């Protein structure tokens, strides 16, 4: 039996996908996000397009809101609003599970993940670590980062297998590429966004273009929004984002 109402707490990738699936099951759904936008890897102007899409499909989107109480059939927000909720789903991020690594005496890194080298070896050369609990190296600044994505875990698993077998291995750094579908929109992001670059005081500029998903002379082309962020001196690409009904994932 479907619940009569649902509240999703958290507006990241998992939260927005869960909200979509609840709506598809015809369950009235609210999504509560503490920041002023969904999907923090996006810059605000693209995140706004995602918010508009979600609201157009009936999601009660509560941005800039925090939860103060969860009851048997409701969720209370800090502003006093009470949302009906026969089911509450928490999608507020993940943290590395490092208890086993600590028990084994392995070194923990600056991001509170398992510290590894370029070949995913831990501080014990006989132990490798891959996946969400292992720190990665950011391709842009060379610092440790956490990127809980399946594709990256798969690639690092292959690095480990090759290294164990004595093959020549090229280290795999991360740029945090992710693609997600939310209702009729495809959303893609890679590299750093402007918020992060500004916070790190890294010079950058951005351009926006709105191409069609395919050649205009072929029917049913859909417009998309693409954003490219780059270093104004070197021209190095620092990040990119895209939102659209078709073609974004192929860019």
Regions found by a protein language model. Give the residues of each.
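FAD-site-proximal beta/loop scaffold in flavoenzymes
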Residues: 1-2, 74-76, 81-162
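Rossmann-like dinucleotide-binding cores of NAD(P)H-dependent redox enzymes
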Residues: 3-8, 13-69, 147-153, 168-195
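Glycine/Thr-rich phosphate-binding loops of Rossmann-like dinucleotide-binding domains
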Residues: 17, 85, 98-99, 137, ...
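General small-molecule cofactor/ligand-binding pocket signal
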Residues: 60-62, 128, 205-207
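A short, glycine/Asx- and small/polar-enriched loop/turn
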Residues: 70-73, 123-124, 219-224
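Short acidic-glycine loop/turn motifs at beta-strand connectors
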Residues: 71, 79, 231-234
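Short, hydrophobic/aromatic-rich segments at coil-to-beta transitions
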Residues: 71-74, 203-205
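Mid-to-C-terminal Rossmann-like scaffold of FAD/NAD(P)H-dependent oxidoreductases
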Residues: 133-248
């Amino acid at each position: 039996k479907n619940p009569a109402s649902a509240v999703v707490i958290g507006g990241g990738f998992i939260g927005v996908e869960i909200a979509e699936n609840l709506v598809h099951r015809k369950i009235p759904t609210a999504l509560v996000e503490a920041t002023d936008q969904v999907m923090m890897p996006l810059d605000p102007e693209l995140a706004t397009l995602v918010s508009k899409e979600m609201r157009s499909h009936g999601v009660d989107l509560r941005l800039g809101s925090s939860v103060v109480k969860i009851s048997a059939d409701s969720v209370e927000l800090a502003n006093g609003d009470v949302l009906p909720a026969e089911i509450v789903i928490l999608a507020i991020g993940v943290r590395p599970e490092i208890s086993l690594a600590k028990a084994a005496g392995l070194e923990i890194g600056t991001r509170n993940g398992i510290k590894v080298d370029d070949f995913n070896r831990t501080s014990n050369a006989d132990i490798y670590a891959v996946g969400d609990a292992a720190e990665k190296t950011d391709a842009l600044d060379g610092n440790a980062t956490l990127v809980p994505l399946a594709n990256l875990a798969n690639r690092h698993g292959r690095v480990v297998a090759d290294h164990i077998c004595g093959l020549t291995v090229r280290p795999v750094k991360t740029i945090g590429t992710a693609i997600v579908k939310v209702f009729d929109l495809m959303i893609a992001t890679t590299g750093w966004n402007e918020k992060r670059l500004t916070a790190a005081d890294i010079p950058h500029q951005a351009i926006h273009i709105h191409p069609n998903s395919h050649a205009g002379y072929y029917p049913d082309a859909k417009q998309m929004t693409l954003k490219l962020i780059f270093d104004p001196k070197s021209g190095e690409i620092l990040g990119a984002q895209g939102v659209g009904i078709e073609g974004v994932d192929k860019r």
